[in-house]
Design a protein with these regions (language model features):
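A conserved alpha-helical element in kinase catalytic cores
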Residues: 155-178
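Middle-to-C-terminal accessory/interaction subdomains
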Residues: 113, 117, 264, 268-330, ...
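Residue-level detector of functionally pivotal "anchor" positions at catalytic/ligand-binding pockets or at interdomain
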Residues: 481-510
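Short, well-structured beta-strand/strand-turn elements
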Residues: 171-188, 325
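A glycine-anchored, Pro-Gly-centered beta-turn/N-cap motif
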Residues: 26, 519-523
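Internal "kinase-insert"/substrate-recognition segments embedded within catalytic cores
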Residues: 128-131, 137, 141-154, 179-182, ...
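C-terminal tail/sorting-segment detector
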Residues: 522-534
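Regulatory N- and C-terminal appendages and interdomain linkers associated
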Residues: 2-108, 413, 417-488
Length: 534
């Protein structure tokens, strides 16, 4: 088959390694463990390359390498899928235990604004020989047929989206074992596109029914009362526009229903093959609640629990404040219902988090701003009114969670270490230098703002991110800690605490050290088990 409009050389296998070609620059890319990046091994591989392909060089990287080649006559675009081939090398053998994995696939550009950049992001759909969907656990991610190659082109650090998702996945509550994650996982890779080096990307999962554990659309013979049961169970909606009233979880006065996959500022992501007015009812019903709660005198947790997963409801805005999301006031956000037959509990899942940590989605430097200047959740109901009137219940629930997060996932040291770790992966693999050489020479305009210049020294960007976070951390302390409930009504149970716990320290029921017992629950302190109820 002719790929990319020209005859492409096959991968080159040298012993245990498979090398992928950059035919434009006459280089072979090989993925090795960091421990194997020795001069002697590289010399051996280089000699073998010269023997097979005189005049070609070798690029050694500790990142997996993906080669995408458009099939002859096909061209990847924004709205039309193109047939492609995918070749993946991974020294950790995370894809079905293989160092080298290959598949056919379909691809298109993803992201409305991001698709205007020369360095595109791609949506991939793996296929078999019959062009049907093919599931595979690429790089050990959730087994499926849809994946995202995130270009991170508007992020001058090439890490914000992945950094934020990693932090979110640490703190986000899971509904049960059927839910793989309430956010995507991903890994850095280096991409070869049609035989030419295309830069560093992040291969990540797509938010979908399988990741969130939503129940499938299914036709039953009858409901419990003998009537015909609705086939709709799990629902997944994506807010695709940030300029629509519905993106603030509110209904227009004269709203109409939809029987398609689009309704005002939202897309029906599942079950997208069965659009109808009924498919939109869970979201409309939720908006009825958020609008009513927006005008209530105080937040009612009991009422809230019938419409949102309670922890998730509070985790989302706090996460938004901690990372200062600039484009996630429900825009770039998913709302899902696992099984609307059983309950009407909604879950919130974030998406596209690159406008964070001191920059917005255009890489404009907004590092002077922290969570104190403006509310990054915009006018979303009921968050804005709860925050602006400093609703005591709302602020206390955020304070309780922030007090827990600030000594663990969102501790300054932990966040800064994560930033340094991601930077180390990019720099030590050589990918950052190649990324700068590939993309900083171009005058890339983004949403009318540009050019975007990458710093050769990545620490310039990471230092800005870390200094911004330290300021934001202090701001969040000042904003939320005054609303911490005072410990009260602590009951002591005569029982021995587990061994190995230090006196004068507080622990939760799982044995994890915490700052203090702030919410109702079981705690361990000074060798005793305590119950707090307020």
């Amino acid at each position: 088959m002719l790929l990319g409009g020209s005859s492409m050389p096959r991968p080159l296998t040298l012993g245990d390694y498979t090398l992928l070609p950059d035919t434009v620059h006459r280089q072979w890319y090989v993925n090795l463990n960091e421990d194997d990046l020795s001069d002697s091994l590289q010399h051996i591989l280089s000699e073998e390359v010269q023997r097979h392909y005189p005049g070609w060089g070798i690029i050694v990287t500790s990142l997996p390498v993906i080669a995408i080649n458009e099939c002859e006559g096909e061209s990847i675009s924004r709205y039309e899928e193109a047939h492609i081939t995918i070749q993946l090398t991974d020294v950790r053998c995370q894809t079905q235990g293989q160092y080298y994995y290959t598949s056919t696939a379909r691809a298109h550009w993803r992201g409305v604004t991001a698709s205007t950049l020369e360095k595109k992001s791609y949506s991939l759909k793996l296929t078999d020989a019959a062009d049907d969907d093919l599931d595979a656990p690429l790089l050990g991610l959730q087994e499926g047929h849809t994946f995202i190659l995130d270009a991170m082109a508007a992020d001058l650090g090439r890490m914000r989206n992945r950094l934020c998702f990693d932090l979110w996945n640490e703190v986000s509550t899971l509904r049960d074992s059927d839910m793989v994650a309430n956010g995507t996982r991903g890994h850095y890779v280096e991409l070869l596109l049609n035989g030419s080096y295309h830069g560093v990307y992040c291969l990540c999962e797509k938010v979908n029914r399988k990741l969130l554990g939503l129940k499938k659309y299914k036709v039953d013979d009858s409901a419990d009362d003998g009537s015909q049961a609705s086939p709709y169970r799990g629902h997944l909606y994506k807010c695709s526009r940030g300029d629509d009233l519905t993106s603030y979880l509110a209904l227009p006065e004269d709203y109409t229903e939809s029987s398609t996959t689009e309704w005002y500022g939202w897309d029906l992501e599942y079950p997208d093959e069965y659009p109808s007015t009924e498919a939109w009812h869970p979201l409309i019903d939720l908006f009825q609640y958020t609008m009513a709660e927006d005008t209530a005198q105080t937040l009612d947790l009991e009422r809230l629990s019938h419409h949102f997963q309670t922890d998730n409801f509070f985790e989302y805005p706090l996460f938004n404040f901690a990372c200062k999301m600039m484009d996630n006031a429900m825009h770039n956000t998913y709302i899902s219902f696992r099984n609307y037959h059983k309950d009407s509990i909604a879950w919130i899942t974030p998406w596209d988090l690159d406008g964070s940590f001191g920059r917005d989605g255009t890489s404009w430097d907004n590092s002077i701003y922290t969570a104190s200047e403006g509310l990054s959740l915009g006018w979303v109901r009921p968050y804005r009114s709860l925050h602006d009137r400093r609703d005591s219940t709302f602020m206390a629930e955020l304070a309780i969670r922030w007090d827990r997060w600030r000594t663990a996932t969102f501790a300054v040291e932990h966040v800064c270490q994560h930033i340094d770790s991601m930077a180390g992966i990019l720099v030590n693999s050589g990918a950052w230098q190649r990324e700068v050489e590939r993309w900083d020479s171009l005058n890339v305009m983004y949403a009318g703002i540009g050019p975007l210049h990458l710093e050769a020294d990545l620490t310039t960007e990471t230092t800005m991110m870390k200094e911004w976070y330290e300021r934001n951390f202090a701001n969040l302390d000042a904003r939320f800690l005054p609303y911490l409930p005072q410990p009260s009504a602590i009951t002591t149970i005569t029982a021995d605490a587990p061994r190995g716990m230090t006196e004068d320290h507080w622990y939760d029921a799982t044995g994890r050290a915490i700052a203090s017992p702030l919410s109702n629950g079981i705690y361990i302190h000074n060798g005793q088990i305590l119950i707090r109820k307020r």
